[in-house]
Regions:
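Histidine-acidic residue clusters that define the catalytic metal-binding segment
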Residues: 280-289
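Small-residue-rich helix-loop
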Residues: 227-280
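Conserved catalytic or metal-liganding residues and their short signature motifs at active sites
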Residues: 1-248, 290-295, 299-307, 315-344
Length: 344
């Protein structure tokens, strides 16, 4: 009888021990899954397309990002048990101090990847913007040629000159975005801004197309950085065109000189004919000369209604505007020939 009772006692003890073991394991798993990872400062991890959690977690473990080996194993088991291992989304994710394994899993299945920034600056030439894009390590570089025609072909706009076609702004994008996708986004942004400004343009302007307005905006962008002067300069240029006067704007001449420009504009440069020399040719240049910002585009389509036909730089970032040549020559003498000493 005693032996039978002992056998029953032992057979009843085994399930209890197993239950206790499972409860202890579950408790330890819960503790580990809710214990912060070993992240002491903001970091990042990249999950490649098709990569499994076991592979990613191994990479993280090699970087010392798990508080313990058990923490990593529990994470893998939990993800598989709850079907989340198959829901991971590729991309680069931010890791912040205090993040737990469960929080990591939520992050990896959210698709909310890190965004990188790249700024295209108002007044830049396309060549400057392209150089910056090519150098960005977070973009995927797929364009083998830097030829403008090939670039425009790649973004689906064959035959267009890229100058002025990409909106200057700060763009945010996930890692491995292609250079083509980035350029297409910037092109679309400019398209939308130009279309909106063209729709709301002032009446009775002499532009034949939005493209002409974009070219004018690029001249305005290069001539001044003072917001209040942009519509005034646009007004000067439009009045000169209406009167059959040449624009005589130095930034266009400089653009036409290309690499021949040595940092100073000379009398000979003004006489050297290029498609962009507005001293030797009538009308607008054939294309924009830079990436104009929205303010410059708005100014080109909402010009000042004054009478000024001339302007000269005063040396302090602003300009002196004149209605006639006599006053303009006097302003040139004052601000260019006899340059005043400007105090900051």
């Amino acid at each position: 009888m005693t032996q039978k009772k002992n056998k029953k006692r032992r057979s009843g003890l085994a399930p209890a021990l197993l239950l206790g073991l499972l409860l202890g394991l579950a408790g330890d798993a819960w503790l580990q899954l809710n214990t912060p990872l070993a992240i002491s400062h903001p970091d990042a991890v990249e999950l490649e397309s098709g990569q499994r959690l076991s592979s990613l977690s191994r990479q993280m473990d090699e970087r010392g990002l798990f508080a313990s080996a058990r923490q990593r194993l529990y994470l893998i088991a939990y993800a598989r048990l709850h079907g989340e291992a198959a829901q991971l989304k590729a991309g680069e994710y931010a890791l912040e101090p205090g993040l737990t394994p469960l929080g990591l899993l939520t992050t990896l299945t959210s698709g909310k990847t890190m965004l990188h920034e790249l700024r295209l600056v108002e007044g830049w030439r396309f060549a400057q913007a392209w150089k910056l894009i090519q150098a960005d390590p977070n973009l995927s570089h797929t364009l083998e040629s830097a030829d403008p025609a090939a670039i425009m072909q790649a973004i689906g706009r064959p035959g267009l000159n890229p100058e002025g076609r990409f909106f200057p702004d700060t763009y945010r994008f996930p890692k491995r975005t292609t250079d083509v996708a980035f350029l297409r986004n910037a092109y679309t942004a400019m398209d939308k801004v130009l279309a909106a400004e063209w729709t709301g343009r002032a009446p009775d302007l002499s532009y034949k197309s939005p493209d002409q307005a974009l070219t004018m905006a690029s001249l305005v962008e290069k001539e001044t950085g003072a917001p209040n002067e942009r519509p005034i300069i646009a007004g000067v240029f439009l009045r000169r065109l209406q009167l059959g006067m040449r624009l005589q704007t130095d930034p266009a001449v400089i653009y036409g000189l290309g690499e021949a420009y040595d940092g100073n504009i000379h009398t000979e440069d003004l006489r050297t004919d290029t498609p962009y020399n507005t001293y030797t040719r009538d009308g607008l240049p054939p294309t924009p000369i830079c990436l104009p910002g929205r303010e410059a585009i708005h100014a080109a389509l909402h010009p000042d209604g004054g009478k000024a036909l001339y302007f000269v730089a005063k040396g302090d970032g602003s300009h002196q505007f004149s209605d006639n040549l006599e006053d303009h020559n006097a302003a040139v003498m004052k601000y260019q020939i006899n340059k005043p000493h400007l105090h900051p």
